[in-house]
C-alpha cells in the first residue's frame, strides 16, 4: 500500500502541484481512509520526501540507461525522453516551483542529486557520442557540464521561459536540440536532423 500511495502521489503532484494537491485530494482519489494514509505518512512533508526518493530512484539512478537503445545516442535520448514524458505525466514546471517555495529543503536535496545525475549523464552521452563518431573531439567537458546543468536549473526558475509563450514540452525539446547542436560534428548534424525529422513525423 505504501508504494501504491507514493506512485499515485507522484503522478498527482506532477499534474497538479506539490502545494495545490492535498492529502485530502489523495485520499479521495485513491478511495482510502485518512487513517490509512497517515499511518504510512504522518505528514504531507513525509509524503513529499518519499515521492522525491521514488522519483530520484527512477530517474537519477538509471541515468546510464538514458543513452541506451537500438538507435544512435541522439535517437536514444529522444526516445527515452518520450518515456519520461509518459511516466511522469508532467506538463508544467509549476510543480517544481511549488516544491521550491513550500518544501525548500526537499527541493535543495533534489537539486543536489540532479546535479550529480546531470554530470553522470553528460559523461555517458559524450562517451557514446564519441564512440559513434557523432560528436566533436574538442569539447570542453567541464564547461559543457556546467552549462548543461545551469540551463536545466534556469529552466525551472519561474518566468524564465513563461509557459504561455514557451509551452513546457516545446521548451524541453528545444533545449535538447540546442544541447546536441553544440556537441555534434558534420556526421552528428546529419543524424540530429534525421532524428528531428522522425520526431516531427511522430515516429519518435
Please annotate each region the language model reported.
Residues 4, 12-46, 50:
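Helix-turn-helix
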Residues 50, 64-91, 145:
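Hydrophobic alpha-helical connector segments
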Residues 89-123, 130-138, 142-143:
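Short secondary-structure transition hinges
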Residues 51, 55, 59, 63, ...:
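Hydrophobic recognition helices of helix-based DNA-binding modules
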Residues 124-128, 165-204:
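C-terminal peripheral helix-coil segments that are non-catalytic and often amphipathic
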Residues 1-10, 26, 51-55, 59, ...:
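Generic hydrophobic, amphipathic alpha-helix propensity
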Amino acid at each position: 500500500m505504501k508504494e501504491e500511495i507514493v506512485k499515485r502521489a507522484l503522478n498527482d503532484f506532477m499534474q497538479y502541484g506539490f502545494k495545490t494537491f492535498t492529502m485530502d485530494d489523495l485520499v479521495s482519489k485513491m478511495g482510502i481512509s485518512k487513517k490509512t494514509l497517515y499511518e504510512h505518512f504522518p505528514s504531507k512533508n513525509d509524503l513529499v520526501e518519499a515521492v522525491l526518493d521514488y522519483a530520484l530512484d527512477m530517474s537519477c539512478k538509471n541515468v546510464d540507461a538514458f543513452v541506451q537503445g537500438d538507435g544512435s545516442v541522439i535517437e536514444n535520448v529522444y526516445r527515452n525522453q518520450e518515456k519520461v514524458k509518459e511516466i511522469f505525466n508532467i506538463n508544467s514546471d509549476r510543480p517544481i516551483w511549488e516544491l521550491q517555495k513550500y518544501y525548500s529543503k526537499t527541493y535543495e536535496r533534489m537539486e543536489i542529486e540532479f546535479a550529480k545525475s546531470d554530470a553522470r549523464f553528460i559523461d555517458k552521452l559524450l562517451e557514446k557520442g564519441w564512440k559513434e563518431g557523432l560528436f566533436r573531439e574538442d569539447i570542453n567537458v567541464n564547461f559543457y557540464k556546467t552549462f548543461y546543468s545551469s540551463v536545466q536549473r534556469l529552466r525551472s526558475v519561474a518566468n524564465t521561459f513563461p509557459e504561455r509563450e514557451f509551452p513546457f514540452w516545446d521548451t524541453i525539446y528545444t533545449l535538447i536540440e540546442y544541447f546536441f547542436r553544440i556537441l555534434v560534428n558534420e556526421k552528428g548534424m546529419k543524424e540530429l536532423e534525421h532524428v528531428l525529422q522522425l520526431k516531427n513525423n511522430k515516429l519518435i
